[in-house]
Amino acid sequence: MELLRTITYQPAAGTKMCEQALGKACGGDSKKKRPQQPSEDGQSQAQVTPAAPHHHHHHSHSGPEISRIIVDPTTGKRYCRGKVLGKGGFAKCYEMTDLTNNKVYAAKIIPHSRVAKPHQREKIDKEIELHRILHHKHVVQFYHYFEDKENIYILLEYCSRRSMAHILKARKVLTEPEVRYYLRQIVSGLKYLHEQEILHRDLKLGNFFINEAMELKVGDFGLAARLEPLEHRRRTICGTPNYLSPEVLNKQGHGCESDIWALGCVMYTMLLGRPPFETTNLKETYRCIREARYTMPSSLLAPAKHLIASMLSKNPEDRPSLDDIIRHDFFLQGFTPDRLSSSCCHTVPDFHLSSPAKNFFKKAAAALFGGKKDKARYNDTHNKVSKEDEDIYKLRHDLKKTSITQQPSKHRTDEELQPPPTTFAKSGTSAVENKQQIGDAIRMIVRGTLGSCSSSSECLEDSTMGSVADTVARVLRGCLENMPEADCIPKEQLSTSFQWVTKWVDYSNKYGFGYQLSDHTVGVLFNNGAHMSLLPDKKTVHYYAELGQCSVFPATDAPEQFISQVTVLKYFSHYMEENLMDGGDLPSVTDIRRPRLYLLQWLKSDKALMMLFNDGTFQVNFYHDHTKIIICNQNEEYLLTYINEDRISTTFRLTTLLMSGCSLELKHRMEYALNMLLQRCN
């Protein structure tokens, strides 16, 4: 059965006035009755022509005229019926106002005469049973259902801006940012349905309803069904013919993948203004669907084409999951607005960033993170390179310097070197437990730095530790200064592998600072500025007296001058293995193509521990709640990982934060991390 199957908007409520006393509460009007308009978008289950809109001609459809005042026989509540919102196979949908509190609902009214046969009534009962248990921000809310002698009434969430079908009818096509905005919400609602083991089975523009705040709600559960194991799946063909998947047409049953297929059709239709499998006759349409044959216009950008093609894969197993869809480059590489103006219902939105700083950073983001290979790309349209473009190019050039040496460490007095008593820290836990808010002033306690720089002048000029720190600081500051305000962490979640510190020990009052990486490499930055790593095989040692000068030897056969340090290294390794737990849920993956990580500098304040590595990886662990921030560079793109108090990690592109903003809890930590980086030499 079809819930809000089609939305036919009637400008004037076309029926008798309520009693005079109730006129205002009802919002009725006294204009003459108008003839019913044909349905605009959704097709009924029995529809046969996919290309043309289907007109229902059931003039006896609703039986006798439905009364303006409707009373719930069980509660005695009185409702006033308003204008028709839409109509479908069995029912009409009306605006309906609860006269006790003036709350407006969308009421689906089904005459008993339309569901007289047992199988018809079963459909209604099944729809009610499925829909009434659903509660999600992006699913039309079911409120109440009752019956009287004439009709069944289902009270649903009222969506004042009608459906996506109406928006597309007015707009013809939508922009990519809008499509991302709506698709995110559809995916969110659909993911919830699939988690409840419910298949929608009729996803289309006419079943996505838009409320006053321009939020999308998935509706119409008339064809919805519980997810069955493959062997028990229904083989019936249902749904709107254009959006039927090959496996449903071939009577192999409907699974989650069939909803993904429909989502691909929806995305295609939003971007191009027509469905992918629209032909002049039904037989040809079905042939195209079975062969997954459709045209992909060159006007679409590559990520959009790729995502549509993956969702419209002929083989259901080749289609992406809902999580894969949200992690696709179409979402990750493009701007998604946080909210849309209601003017988008009829007018193309303007997403132009007005502030020059934001424009600069948007271009910088494209240069830094978009994988642009050379400066020439920016000179295509300008004979002369603008100052802004030069700044961007310089910024990108700085980011590519990942082989780092560092500035000579300062000689410190014994007093400065004396840290607090020995502190063994469990995965970022410290003896310092500070409950205060993270603030601007950084109170340094102790630090350690890798030994003096090599004699090469190029090393001093290009690859000093200062260069690494400055580059990370510049990118972090650029993101913080230009990202919009937001109240939550972006939805993006990348699955990527990188090295980070899972355990650490500060024994700097005697030997130095030890840490374990996620690939189980153990490193120690000794108080004398030397660095030693024990590789995951526990057999090989890498020794750095100075940056870029690495000695490699077996752990069991160390040169005489290193024996005592190797003993300390093994002690750190054993201690962390036995006593400390991992500080997060990130997978431990080793990528042998990536350079070995070693620590350039570590620094402890009264609130956090900062670690800066040779390849620009930057990690800050906060003591009081064990949250962590990790910034790393992969394929000329900066990623930020946030590990929350529950040790659950989320990874974003910095460009995503730049465009979407983030929660205050993350922003405050990013600001503190930046201050630690800037004040590291103080």
From Swiss-Prot:
An example Gene Ontology CC term for this record: chromatin
Keyword DNA-binding among record annotations: no
Family: Belongs to the protein kinase superfamily. Ser/Thr protein kinase family. CDC5/Polo subfamily.
Natural source organism: Rattus norvegicus (Rat)
EC number assigned by the record: 2.7.11.21
Active site positions: 202
Encoding gene (name): Plk2
Spans annotated as Disordered: 25-67, 402-430
Stated role: Tumor suppressor serine/threonine-protein kinase involved in synaptic plasticity, centriole duplication and G1/S phase transition. Polo-like kinases act by binding and phosphorylating proteins that are already phosphorylated on a specific motif recognized by the POLO box domains. Phosphorylates CPAP, NPM1, RAPGEF2, RASGRF1, SNCA, SIPA1L1 and SYNGAP1.
Protein name: Serine/threonine-protein kinase PLK2
Any one Gene Ontology molecular-function term assigned to this protein's record: GTPase binding
Residues carrying Phosphothreonine: 236
Chief location: cytoplasm
Annotated Pfam families: Pkinase, POLO_box
